């Protein structure tokens, strides 16, 4: 745990309905209990401006390139106003979604879009990538059942199983592309506390 006493950037990734936000919250609470200076944030969002952009992104019908640029603009504000200052102050930053979600939700809709997402990120913030990313691996059929049981929904929630499978395959591909950064946590048959224990082993 000593390596978390200085600033460290941790992200949680995966499709909807996988328990990703739950795990981010559990890790946040655990690190606080260890007297670690830690903040929990999310994307798209995390700042007042970025949250306004999020509302447009998740509810309005945008052209694919417009959607990507909206997500990137929100991230820039989030990084500049919140993430970077916290890291500079020595905090651990836990973020519920980051660049990999943009690749799998917005990048997939564009030709060569995934590479475009990472190239844009290098231009905007060339030195900021997570030290570790947890991909919560839950089968799409299970994930969509969980989403359908929720009362709230946005345009991504209602796209159907084919969309969920496409996003899932994208995250799997990214975990193979960036194996040193992305740690896959197979969670389909595990309880939240069991998943949390697996995550702690990587810290």
Curated annotation (Swiss-Prot):
Pfam families: Thymidylate_kin
Organism domain of life: Bacteria
Catalytic reactions of this protein: dTMP + ATP = dTDP + ADP
Keywords for the protein's UniProt record, in alphabetical order: ATP-binding, Kinase, Nucleotide biosynthesis, Nucleotide-binding, Transferase
Top EC class for this record: transferase
A GO-annotated cellular component: cytosol
EC number: 2.7.4.9
GO-annotated biological processes: dTDP biosynthetic process; dTTP biosynthetic process; dUDP biosynthetic process
Coiled coil: none
Molecular function terms, GO-annotated: ATP binding; dTMP kinase activity
Positions contributing to ATP binding: 14-21
Protein's job: Phosphorylation of dTMP to form dTDP in both de novo and salvage pathways of dTTP synthesis.
Family named by the database record: Belongs to the thymidylate kinase family.
Entry protein name: Thymidylate kinase
Species in which this protein is naturally found: Rickettsia akari (strain Hartford)
